[in-house]
């Protein structure tokens, strides 16, 4: 298993080392077509500028609205203090105020129109940038899969060799262990068989059991 693991790690390290990296002071290699993020980044920058314009127009409209509300509140307070109702033809100051309000209204409407256009352009650019980013990411993913496939195919013979070596070493160890167990079991069996031989405990030797010639 150690040989197999070292072989796999060696294949990964070799694949990483085989990557083309620019040397110091050397230009980086030009990316493959369809894998650059330049177009996506430019669209995002344009969308950010349009969104900034929308915020500016919105701030202008909010300022004009706040100014109109402040002027209207001051006029109502002055009319209430004088004890009369506000009318558009009471004095020349009221006419000037109405003209100013009309001008502010026109400016606010124009600013709102420009802000809406900026928001639409910003949304469109953001959507285009998103689609472009998805396309670039998909292209890069396909190229990465292709390069990984080539690396894996190149490392298959080396991995097969390591697997064969690991299997052969395991098989040799297993056979050696099996042979050792068989030898260990046979020796005690032979000794046990020798101990089972009939003994002549308490019996005279075979020569002493022959009839003696004293009685003949």
Curated annotation (Swiss-Prot):
This protein's name: Sporozoite antigen
Record's superkingdom?
Eukaryota
Write down the species. Answer: Eimeria tenella
The UniProt annotation puts the region (Disordered) at: 194-216
């Amino acid at each position: 298993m150690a040989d197999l693991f070292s072989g796999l790690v060696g294949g990964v390290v070799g694949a990483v080392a085989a990557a083309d990296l620019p040397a110091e002071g050397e230009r980086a290699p030009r990316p493959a077509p369809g894998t650059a993020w330049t177009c996506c980044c430019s669209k995002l920058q344009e969308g950010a500028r349009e969104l900034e314009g929308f915020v500016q127009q919105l701030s202008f409209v909010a300022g004009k609205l706040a100014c109109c509300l402040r002027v209207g509140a001051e006029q109502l307070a002055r009319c209430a203090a004088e004890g009369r109702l506000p009318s558009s033809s009471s004095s020349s100051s009221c006419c000037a105020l109405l003209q100013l309000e009309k001008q502010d209204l026109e400016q606010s409407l124009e600013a709102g129109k420009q802000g809406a256009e900026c928001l639409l352009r910003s949304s469109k650019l953001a959507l285009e940038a998103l689609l472009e980013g998805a396309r670039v990411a998909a292209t890069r993913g396909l190229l990465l899969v292709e390069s990984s496939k080539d690396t894996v195919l190149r490392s298959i013979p080396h991995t097969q060799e390591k697997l064969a070596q690991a299997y052969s070493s395991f098989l040799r160890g297993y056979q050696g262990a099996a042979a050792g167990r068989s030898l260990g079991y046979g020796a005690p069996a032979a000794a046990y068989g020798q101990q089972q031989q009939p003994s002549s405990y308490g019996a005279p030797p075979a020569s002493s059991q022959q009839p003696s010639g004293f009685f003949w």
